[in-house]
UniProtKB/Swiss-Prot annotation:
Heme binds at C469. It is found in: Membrane. It is an enzyme of class 1 (oxidoreductase). PANTHER family: P450, PUTATIVE (EUROFUNG)-RELATED. Induction: Up-regulated when grown on alkanes as sole carbon source. It is a single-pass membrane protein. InterPro entries: Cyt_P450, Cyt_P450_CS, Cyt_P450_E_CYP52_ascomycetes, Cyt_P450_E_CYP52_fungi, Cyt_P450_E_grp-II, Cyt_P450_sf. This is Cytochrome P450 52-N1. It comes from Starmerella bombicola. GO terms for cellular component: membrane. Catalyzes the terminal (at the omega-position) hydroxylation of a fatty acid. Probably involved in alkane metabolism. Its cofactor is heme. SUPFAM superfamilies: Cytochrome P450 (SSF48264). Belongs to the cytochrome P450 family.
Length: 523
């Protein structure tokens, strides 16, 4: 009897989720709210087939290409689809994305995505909603003034270390790994006032060495980078598993140990910041010395947990995204030697003596063709390729419903709206027939078109609206300076013998070049 009851309950649940909701309940509620019919991408039962395909493609580093091929082959840009039993709305329509991120901003939140990331990276600006998020934004935004984001001298030292490492290897290197080490160093230097020195770790030197006060374990730079990388992947796994996120905890029992190692390092710098600012007097001009991000935050809050969480959030955003953009830039430039030569020519017009050691923030903006290349890299490889929000109340998107797709789309409270930036940036309706091609020329001012992404929400590498990335100018400064110093140092960029020109785009919390990375020869 119990078995029959269980089977009956499951059959009723299946009937509701796979038939009644998509074909009866949702359409009736949409009509009540004066919204139109929306296409349905069916994957019976409970979206399980789609879920299994997504997990399979993710393991093979083929998820982004698979999703783009699927979505761009459909005649519509907004649809209702099922994933792990839940019905979600997916859209690549710029007007709908604008509504989610800007015009109807208060109708949406991070919801489960924020909660799941919070279990890993803490309660900070990238995991918060509502009043806590506004408080964090107001606290953090002043730290990204032009004076701070244009600290070229801070970045320049670490880029010089990168160049030294490339020279040591004879110019035959895998750049993606080096870029991730360099951006870890620049990010920690900016945040903590000193770098963890991951690029300089070699032989007997293990970089920083910090003792966990609870366990006595010594955590060095190698340990920190390893555990930080694990935390990144673990957070993504929890997001993908959705309501089954507990499976991530069960299948990765070492996650607590990895997080403890990361926290050991973060807590060390938090305590240094608290100690350095314990007698802070805002009216005492003599205290205004060298800028440290952690010290400035410690002047605003004395809560060590809050400080750690905010610093962890900023580190995640500032390190991996910049490394991803630099990696893709050199991947595409390796495949396009004529464009590399043109970038070098452009940079030499700004720095005719071949020396950018005294470059200023304003100098970086003068390399116009380089800026076009960076824009194109961010189009094809947006650092955060997939994103989502959830409706906090019954609301609607401006279009996508009805036979012609020009009626509003009903979004019930609690429903997730997925907007894949990676696919949006490849839409031929926005970028033309060559949307998949690496073509910096499309960004020339004279090439502006009525449907140009410069005038729409078809180009959002840093998101948009109130939650637009507050550190984007710092990231663009680091990307531009790194590329300038590398092209000035190395006249030639060639593929290494094991360079893979047609790599898959790998999705972690950020996008990464898959396969063996970016294997090149620089000379």
């Amino acid at each position: 009897m119990i078995l029959y009851a269980v089977l009956g309950a499951f059959a009723a649940f299946l009937l509701y989720m796979d038939v009644l909701y998509p074909f009866v309940i949702y359409p009736l509620r949409a009509r009540w709210h004066k919204c139109g019919y929306i296409p349905r991408d069916l994957s019976w039962p409970l979206g399980i087939p789609l879920t299994l395909v997504v997990l399979s493609k993710l393991r093979k580093d083929m998820l982004l290409q698979f999703m783009a091929a699927q979505d761009l082959s459909r005649p519509y840009k907004t649809s209702l689809r099922q994933f792990l039993g839940k019905w979600v709305i997916a859209t690549r329509d710029p007007e709908n994305i604008k509504a989610v991120l800007s015009t109807k901003f208060n109708d949406f939140s991070l919801k489960e995505r924020g909660n799941r990331m919070r279990h890993v990276i803490g309660d900070g600006i990238f995991t918060q909603d509502g009043a806590p998020w506004k408080h964090s934004r107001d606290m953090l935004r002043p730290q990204f003034t032009k004076d701070q984001i244009s600290r070229v001298e801070l970045l320049s030292h670490h880029i010089d270390v990168l160049i030294r490492e490339i020279r040591k290897s004879g110019g035959n290197v895998e750049l993606q790994r080096l870029f991730h080490l360099m951006t870890m160093d620049t990010a920690t230097h900016f945040l903590f006032g000193e770098s963890v020195g991951s690029l300089e770790v070699s032989g007997e030197s293990k970089g920083i060495e910090i003792t966990d006060p609870k366990t006595g374990e010594i955590v060095n730079t190698v340990d920190f980078v390893e555990s930080y990388t694990f935390a990144n992947k673990f957070a993504l796994k929890k997001i993908i598993l959705n309501d089954l996120e507990f499976l991530a905890d069960l299948t990765e029992p070492s996650y607590k140990w990895h997080l403890r190692r990361v926290h050991t390092v973060m807590d060390h710098y938090v305590q240094l910041a608290l100690k350095a600012t314990e007698k802070y007097d805002p009216d005492d001009d003599s205290e205004k010395g060298e800028y440290y991000f952690s010290h400035e935050l410690a002047k605003l809050t004395r809560d060590p947990l809050s400080l750690r969480d905010q610093l962890f959030n900023i580190l995640i955003a500032g390190r991996d995204t910049t490394a991803a953009t630099l990696s893709y830039a050199f991947h595409y430039l390796t495949k396009n030697p004529a464009i590399y030569a043109k970038v070098r020519e452009d940079v030499l017009t700004v720095f005719p003596n071949g020396d950018a050691s005294l470059a200023t923030y304003e100098d970086l903006r003068k390399a116009k063709y380089l800026q076009m290349v960076i824009k194109e890299v961010l189009r094809l490889a947006p650092a955060v390729p997939l994103n989502t929000r959830a409706a906090v109340r019954d609301t609607y998107l401006p279009r996508g419903g009805g036979p012609a797709g020009n009626l509003p789309v009903f979004v019930p409270k609690g429903t997730a709206v997925n907007y894949p930036t990676y696919i949006l940036h490849r839409d031929p309706d926005i970028y033309g027939a060559d949307a998949y091609e690496f073509n910096p020329e499309r960004w020339r001012p004279e090439n502006k078109l009525p449907n140009s992404p410069m005038y729409s929400w078809g180009y959002i590498p840093f998101n948009g609206g109130p939650r637009i990335c507050i550190g984007q100018q710092f990231a663009l400064t680091e990307i531009a300076l790194t590329m300038i110093k590398l092209v000035l140092e190395f006249e030639r960029l060639e593929p290494a013998d094991d360079f893979e020109p047609n790599l898959q785009d790998k999705s972690s919390l950020t996008v990464m070049v898959g396969g063996s990375g970016v294997r090149v020869k620089l000379s």
